[in-house]
């Protein structure tokens, strides 16, 4: 009997991607996050679709429609909390996925890495426009502040900002188009994910040792499907604990007040997953300089393959590179903390030092560490 899984044109694609896929035998739990991100994206699209059925993208009714979802729609509170906290889980998995890529040298698979960085930027854009939709105080002022950054672009800045707004300030037209963007972008993300996986199929997965794993591979199913299922259980446990016990702990209390253009909140700040970039933005007194540093903090990932100087693919065996990597991790946590603090001393100077160290680590120190490791490997006789 012919095995349909291996011959059917559609099932064959699924089979080669998730069942008979040859995977390195030594990949650790750090390789779980790809599948977890797929689950997060699915949760976000499904919950978002149900929320869109009840949401109205009008400045007069947006806030009350979100309240209506939470109070009157069957399980609306659950769908809304899953969507809001699902975004936090999505970014947590994203940051860990990128961190694993840096630690184990996955950025050497350039096409997969570059599509991944584009995916990161697209997800960040989607999350930003989504945060504006409830039309609370922080939604409105966050949108005003971030879109205002466009006006820092020389010559065309003001025109560009007004074009995005659809008027002379953040208003009804802005909310309507942000809802349109927030609806369409997840489907663009899905298409990019397929391209990401396509490039990954070309090279095969990386592995902790950084050594070519072709000599020792095992089928993805059942070994890694079981392993991913365990990761999925942990993800759902954390997400449901957050949603059912403390759904508003990661949000901002100001967003429980309807948007008021005449009343500025004491401290405008985005969601926690943007705080590191927000701190870098604030660390430079010049508006254009801050915007460029903000963009550079993400786009710097694109040049990582060119900054790779060591002969080793992975940091697994190199204590110097490992130390710098964990300093970078601690530095990003510090920047996240600073981003949530008011713009005053001593937070300003801490933010400036952490921002400088962020770029210094990636551009110079990690590059020098690679050269030092190469030197240490050379025979001395």
From Swiss-Prot:
* Species: Sminthopsis aitkeni (Kangaroo island dunnart)
| Principal place of residence | mitochondrion
* UniProt-recorded name of the protein: Cytochrome b
Has the keyword Lipoprotein been applied to this entry? no
Q: Name one GO cellular component term.
A: respiratory chain complex III
- Judging by the UniProt lineage, the source's domain of life is Eukaryota
Membrane topology according to the record:
Multi-pass membrane protein
Q: Which Pfam families match?
A: Cytochrom_B_C, Cytochrome_B
As recorded in Swiss-Prot or TrEMBL, the protein's gene is named: MT-CYB
How does it associate, per the subunit comment?
The cytochrome bc1 complex contains 11 subunits: 3 respiratory subunits (MT-CYB, CYC1 and UQCRFS1), 2 core proteins (UQCRC1 and UQCRC2) and 6 low-molecular weight proteins (UQCRH/QCR6, UQCRB/QCR7, UQCRQ/QCR8, UQCR10/QCR9, UQCR11/QCR10 and a cleavage product of UQCRFS1). This cytochrome bc1 complex then forms a dimer.
Which molecular-function annotations from GO does this UniProt entry contain?
A: metal ion binding; ubiquinol-cytochrome-c reductase activity
Q: What processes in GO biological process is this protein linked to?
A: mitochondrial electron transport, ubiquinol to cytochrome c
Q: Which InterPro entries match?
A: Cyt_b/b6_C, Cyt_b/b6_C_sf, Cyt_b/b6_N, Cytb/b6-like_sf, Cytochrome_b, Cytochrome_b_C_euk/bac, Cytochrome_b_N_euk/bac, Di-haem_cyt_TM
Q: Which cofactor does it need?
A: heme b
- Compartments reported by the entry: Mitochondrion inner membrane
* Ranges that cross the membrane: 33-53, 77-98, 113-133, 178-198, 226-246, 288-308, 320-340, 347-367
Q: Which residues bind heme b b562?
A: 83, 182
Task: Please tell me what else the database record remarks about this protein.
Answer: Heme 1 (or BL or b562) is low-potential and absorbs at about 562 nm, and heme 2 (or BH or b566) is high-potential and absorbs at about 566 nm.
Q: Which UniProt keywords apply?
A: Electron transport, Heme, Iron, Membrane, Metal-binding, Mitochondrion, Mitochondrion inner membrane, Respiratory chain, Transmembrane, Transmembrane helix, Transport, Ubiquinone
- Can you quote the record's cofactor note? Binds 2 heme b groups non-covalently.
* Family label: Belongs to the cytochrome b family.
CDD domains per the UniProt record, alphabetical: cytochrome_b_C (cd00290), Cytochrome_b_N (cd00284)
The task this protein performs is described as: Component of the ubiquinol-cytochrome c reductase complex (complex III or cytochrome b-c1 complex) that is part of the mitochondrial respiratory chain. The b-c1 complex mediates electron transfer from ubiquinol to cytochrome c. Contributes to the generation of a proton gradient across the mitochondrial membrane that is then used for ATP synthesis.
Disulfide bridge partners, by residue number: none
Q: Is Heme among this UniProt entry's keywords? A: yes
């Amino acid at each position: 009997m012919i095995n349909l899984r291996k011959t059917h044109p559609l099932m064959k694609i699924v089979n080669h991607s998730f069942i008979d896929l040859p995977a390195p035998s030594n990949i650790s739990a750090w390789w779980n996050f790809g599948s977890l991100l797929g689950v997060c994206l699915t949760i976000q699209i499904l919950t978002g679709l149900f929320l869109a059925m009840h949401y109205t993208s009008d400045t007069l009714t947006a806030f009350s429609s979100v309240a209506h979802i939470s109070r009157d729609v069957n399980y609306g509170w659950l769908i809304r909390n899953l969507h809001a906290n699902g975004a936090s889980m999505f970014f947590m998995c994203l940051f860990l996925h990128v961190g694993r890529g840096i630690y184990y040298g996955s950025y050497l698979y350039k096409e997969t890495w570059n599509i991944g960085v584009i995916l990161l930027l697209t997800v960040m854009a989607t999350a930003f426009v989504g945060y504006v939709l409830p039309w609370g105080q922080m939604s409105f002022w966050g949108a005003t502040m971030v879109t205002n950054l466009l006006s820092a672009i020389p010559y065309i800045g003001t025109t560009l900002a007004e074009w995005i707004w659809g008027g002379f300030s953040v208003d009804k037209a802005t909310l309507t188009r942000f809802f349109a963007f927030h609806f369409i972008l997840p489907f663009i993300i899905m298409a990019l994910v397929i391209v990401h996986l396509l490039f990954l199929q070309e090279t095969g997965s990386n592995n902790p040792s950084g050594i070519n794993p072709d000599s020792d591979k095992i089928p993805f199913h059942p070994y890694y499907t079981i392993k991913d299922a365990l990761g999925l259980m942990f993800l759902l446990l954390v997400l449901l604990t957050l949603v059912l016990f403390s759904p508003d702990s990661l949000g901002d209390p100001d967003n429980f007040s309807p948007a008021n253009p005449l009343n500025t909140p004491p401290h405008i700040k985005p969601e926690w997953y943007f705080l590191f970039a927000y701190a870098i933005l604030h660390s430079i007194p010049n508006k254009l300089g801050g915007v460029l540093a903000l963009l550079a903090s993400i786009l710097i990932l694109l040049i990582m393959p060119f900054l790779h100087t060591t002969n080793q693919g992975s940091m697994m065996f190199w204590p110097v590179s490992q130390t710098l990597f964990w300093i970078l991790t601690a530095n990003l946590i510090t920047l996240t903390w600073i981003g949530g603090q008011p713009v005053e001393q001593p937070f300003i100077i801490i933010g400036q030092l952490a921002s400088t160290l962020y770029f210094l680590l990636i551009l110079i120190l990690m590059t020098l560490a690679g050269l030092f490791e190469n030197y240490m490997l050379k025979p001395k006789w």
